[in-house]
Amino acid sequence: MSEMMIVAVTGGKGGTGKSTLSANLFFYFIENYKTALIDCDVETPNLPYLTGCEDLFLAREVFIEVPNIEEGKTYNYNNVCKEGALLKVGDKLIFIEDLCSGCKACGINSNITFKKKSIGKIYEKKFDNGYLIVGKSNLGERKTAKIVTETKKYGLSKNCEINIVDTAAGTHCNVVRALINADKVLIVTEPTPFGVSDAKRIIKVVEKLNIPYKIVLNRYGISDLKIGYNFKIPYDKRIVECYCKGESFLKYNDLRNYIEEIANWIIWG
């Protein structure tokens, strides 16, 4: 294992159990390794609940810079906004703040000035041998890319031996941002038609990024659907009970074995 291992846990669709896997891997690793659990699902972070840690403290706020358009002022706008956040109507420049990503391209060769806008926050919880780092977008915020980037950056700044990055579901840009620079990827799926279909999509993304990956079949046993996998986690009532309580299921030795098998691949390959 390298000095700093980054493993991303992802899945093509929501609800497959990737965050449950991330949380239990975290509790397994902190027994012997300094570990960071980084929640990059910034629009719907749920690792605080799955780890029983709702008492996080605010580590930092995430800002972007947006145009400061003043009423009655004339601007020599360069018409480069790909998001459509700036519209020229006659001599008037209209700014639609919700569409702005903060790229500041509109300020090139222009008299447009900028102001800070808060788009989200990063929260932290310290454990004896690790950290839970959680990015969370402000309510209604549409442009959340920088929150993902800053959350991951802040988590990695803790210099932990193991870094578990929990991504959002899907194959969109924020998922890619969370996956970039990972040493290994765990793709979590389930034996359902949607699970198989969406797993194929995220596999293509991970292969494009050229990152080694393994497939974890969660809820093994709920159907006879055939799907290739490397590791499995069975459908078990005890896992559901632990999930609802925000607890790890590692206390059950037979279930712990499934996590240990995955952890061994992360550490030893």
Curated annotation (Swiss-Prot):
UniProt keyword annotations, A-Z? ATP-binding, Nucleotide-binding
Q: Which SUPFAM superfamilies match?
A: P-loop containing nucleoside triphosphate hydrolases (SSF52540)
- Extract the GO molecular function terms from the UniProt entry: ATP binding
Question: What Pfam families is this protein classified in?
Answer: CbiA
Task: Report the PANTHER family cross-referenced here.
Answer: 4FE-4S CLUSTER CONTAINING PARA FAMILY ATPASE PROTEIN
Coiled-coil residues are none
Source organism superkingdom: Archaea
Family per UniProt?
Answer: To M.jannaschii MJ0578.
What protein am I looking at? Uncharacterized protein MJ0579
Q: Please name the InterPro entries in this protein's record.
A: CobQ/CobB/MinD/ParA_Nub-bd_dom, P-loop_NTPase
**Positions of ATP binding:** 12-19, 130-137
